Each structure stands twice: as C-alpha cells, then as structure tokens.
Design a protein with these regions (language model features):
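Carboxylate- and glycine-rich phosphate/diphosphate-binding segment that chelates Mg2+/Mn2+
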Residues: 198-310
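C-terminal segments
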Residues: 1-49
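ATP/NTP phosphate-donor binding region
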Residues: 46-132, 406
Length: 475
C-alpha cells in the first residue's frame, strides 16, 4: 500500500512536543496546546545559474565576437571533415589570422568521438601549444574539444574519476581540476540542437572497451559561445528535425527537473515558445525563412542554458543507452521517448518519491500544465493540459517526419527485446536519472522502453495490493 501526505498539514492533536505521548495515551487537554510541536521542514540548498562569460548572437556576429581573441597567440580549431572540406572553417581561419593569431585545424572528429581521436587531437595541441581552443561544429566536435581541453590542461586525469556520478555537482567526491590555465575554450555551433556551446557536459567513447564516459562539471563550460545563425542556414532537413526535437526535449526536461528554479524556468519556457513558433518553418522552408532558422538556433542555446543548470531526466537517460546500443542519433532517440516520458512523469502518486531538498511533492502534472498554458494550448484541467502537450509534441514530430516508434526507426525486434533489460538497468544508473521529477524503478524504465518500441501510449500499471492470509477465502 502506498500512503502519501504531500498535501496534509500537521495535526495539533496527533502527538505533542517534548513531553512525548500521543493522542491516545491520555485525554488531550489544555496543557498539550502549550507544548508546541516543532515541525521539521526541508532546508533548501543554495542554487546557482552558470553560463559562459560571453554569449554572442545574431546573424553575422562571428567576426565581431572573435575580436575577443585579439590578445591571444595561437588557436587550435577542432571540427569535422565535412565542415573542413566544404569551406565552413575558412572564414574563421581568415579572421583569426588577420588578427595576428597562428591557426591550426584538427578536422578528424566523427560522430560519437572516441578517445583515439581525442588523443590524436591532443598530440597536435601538445606540439602547437595553443592558448585558444575553438570548437566549430555540432555536438561531436564540441565534445571532442572539451575532452581534449581537459587532457591538454591536465594529462594526469583518469576518466573513471571524471565520470563518477554525483547527486550535487558542487559536492562531487572527485574534485574536477581547474581549467583555463593553458587555454580558453570558444564554442561556435553549426547545428541547432545540442546547446553544447553553453553546457558543462561532454561525452567520449573508449573505442577499446566500448564504454561511454559522460563528463559533467562547470569547469567544462566554454568561456565564449558564438551563436551565429549564418552558420546554420544550409543545414539539411534531417539535421534540422533531429536537432530541433533535441532542443524541445532539453527544455521540457529542464522545466520539470527537480532542480528547476526561477532562473532556468524562464529560459526553458522561452526556448519552447520559440521552437513552437519557428521549428516547423525552419524545417519546411530552410534558408528561405532565415528568421525562423535564427530563432531556432537561439532557442537551442537558450534551452542549453536551462538544462546546464536544471539538468535533465529519464528521457535522456534512456536515449543515451538506446542511441549507443542501436546507433541512433541522439536527438532521434530523445524524440522516440519523450511523449511517453511526459505521460510517465505526469503522476500524482509515483511509485517512489524523488529525493531532493527543494522538491517536496510530485509536481509533474502541474509543471507540464504550466508549459501547455505558456504555449497557448487550451484545456480545462491540468491533466487535460498534459494530454494537449503530448498531442503538440506528437504533432510536431509528425511535421518533422520523425518515426512514430523505435521499431519504425529500424531497430530489430528480437535484438531490442534481448537487450531491453540491460538498457533499463543502464538507464537507471545514468547521471540524468537523479534529476527526473519522478524517481523510476528499473521495471518502469523497461515498460517505457517497450511502450516506445511499439509506439504505444504509456499507461500506468499498478500491482495489486497483497492480500492478507484468509482474505480471499473470506471474500
């Protein structure tokens, strides 16, 4: 049996203060009213809101923003082969050289960067000795650049230590080394979605063991983010769709996180509003609607700031494992899960209450309803607002051409069913799980994965209450 008292005020009669006793140990009299009980309240931790020192935005801001590097000597640009071979790096190199900087380019980053690639980039850095590292590209070049930055500044680090999980990023067992002694980090996104240019996160894969190391610490936050929408005007439609829904997921999870606060809320809501108004046109019209492209690019960054401080939830926990196991793009994996995650989190009676000092009761329904109202959706109750929010997300995915299920995305059924138990276990142990508004059971994560595989709407399944011996006979 589950008993919740989230909305009950303390009773004046059920027990007294320091004298002990309870309401049935003796008749309650006037003396008990004098002995006031002390009601324990949760103490809230100090919160924070961290972001890069400088964020430049608006189309064409790149040359002006790079003037911040005028006092630097050597810049190592980290990018991928496609951007390098198609001229996306040329303008940046030209601007930096005009300012008197020596420039070298590492362009061998691929999707899901590996330690081998990062070490190759590190060899170039150690020989060149840059005082600026500039990541140019999507999430993969930024991840590679951030990890290389750590290894360049602190060759003694062990990734097992850096990847150690924590409940509070400020109170981790392993203290992250101080960054920025040798070089500063500049991030220039050429895709709209990851928000990595403003976040303290990076992921690298050990190609030998297959282990993914998710690294999280505010020391990894870039010093400068340059959000120039001119760099995303010609993004292909598939990348626009996957990146856009990734940004939507970032904002949704940040808003309902147990660590959400007044500062991150505003950014999550604004990001969702911009995405609702502009993502469909950005996808359908591309460079023919430059304003929509720019607003989606800004929304991606704003959502990044929100989840950099409020963190994410079980949608990302499962997407990390699903994408890695079946080679699905991260944004696509999120898209295949987010609708059912909303349904799962919108529960007034969770199986297990999440543990965080400022999160004193389930707020999933209330918070999702607030999002729906902010987006202008219409309903008559909070639960109906949640349904309307899911309908909007599903409608957006349909416009973007995203498959309706994991199965429709091409994942083999037998292979998925053979691995779903391990996926659920690994997702439970993911760093993102702790900030989810509903603390999950592994069995619940498995059900979410199964429902999402077949494209079924998640619904709560309650186990029957255990019967007392003889109860069934009496019935």
């Amino acid at each position: 049996m589950r008993l919740y008292n989230f909305n009950l005020a303390p009773s004046l009669t059920l027990g007294c203060g320091s004298w002990g006793g309870n309401s049935i140990s003796e008749n309650v009299g006037p003396k008990h009213l004098i002995n006031k009980k002390t009601v324990a309240k949760r103490a809230e931790n100090m919160l924070w809101h961290k972001l890069p020192k400088s964020i430049y935005f608006r189309r064409g801001c790149l040359p002006i923003a790079l003037e911040d590097l005028a006092d630097r000597k050597r810049c190592l640009i980290v990018t991928d082969r496609y951007l390098f071979e198609n001229g996306y790096v040329d303008d940046t190199v030209r601007i930096l050289k005009k300012q008197g900087l020596e420039v070298e380019v590492f362009h061998e980053v691929a999707a899901d960067p590996t330690l081998a690639v990062v070490r190759k980039c590190l060899s170039m850095a150690n020989a060149f000795k840059p005082d600026v590292i500039l990541a140019l590209g999507g999430g993969s070049p930024m991840d590679a650049a951030k990890i290389m930055w750590v290894m360049y500044e602190h060759p003694e680090v062990q990734f097992e230590d850096l990847a150690m999980r924590f409940m509070d990023i400020r109170k981790r067992i392993y203290k992250f080394p101080k960054m920025g002694i040798k070089a500063m980090m500049v991030a220039v996104p050429t895709t709209s979605g990851t928000g990595s240019e403003v976040t303290p996160f990076a992921v690298v894969t050990d190609e030998v063991t297959g282990v993914k190391y998710p690294i999280a610490d505010y020391e990894l936050t870039p010093n400068i983010a340059i959000v120039d929408a001119n760099l995303v005007m010609n993004m292909p439609k598939s990348l626009t769709a996957i990146g856009g829904i990734d940004a939507v997921t970032h904002a949704l999870e940040a808003y309902v996180s147990v660590m959400a606060n007044e500062y991150s809320d505003a950014q999550a809501l604004q990001a969702l509003k911009l995405l609702k108004e502009n993502l469909p046109s950005s996808f359908l019209n591309g460079a023919n609607d430059p304003k929509a492209r720019e607003q989606v690019h800004n929304a991606s960054c704003i959502a990044g700031i929100a989840f950099a401080n409020a963190f994410l939830g079980v949608c990302h926990s499962m997407a990390h494992k699903l994408g890695a196991e079946f080679h699905l793009a991260h944004g696509l994996a999120n898209a295949l899960l987010i609708s059912n995650v909303i349904r799962y989190n919108a529960a007034d009676i969770p199986t297990k209450q999440t543990a965080f000092s400022q999160y004193d009761r389930p707020k999933g329904v209330e918070r999702y309803a607030q999002i729906a109202k902010h987006l202008g959706l219409e309903a008559t109750s909070d639960h109906e607002y949640v349904e309307k929010l899911v309908e909007w997300v599903d409608g957006l995915k349909s416009v973007l051409g995203i498959p309706v299920s994991i199965q429709a995305a091409g994942v083999d059924e037998a292979d998925f069913l053979a691995k779903v138990d391990k996926l659920a276990e690994d997702a439970f142990d993911d760093q993102c799980t702790g900030a989810n508004p509903r603390f999950p059971l592994i069995s619940e994560l498995k059900e979410l994965l199964l429902h999402s595989y077949y494209g079924h709407a998640y619904h709560e399944v309650y186990e029957p209450e255990p019967q007392e011996i003889g109860e069934s006979e009496a019935a």
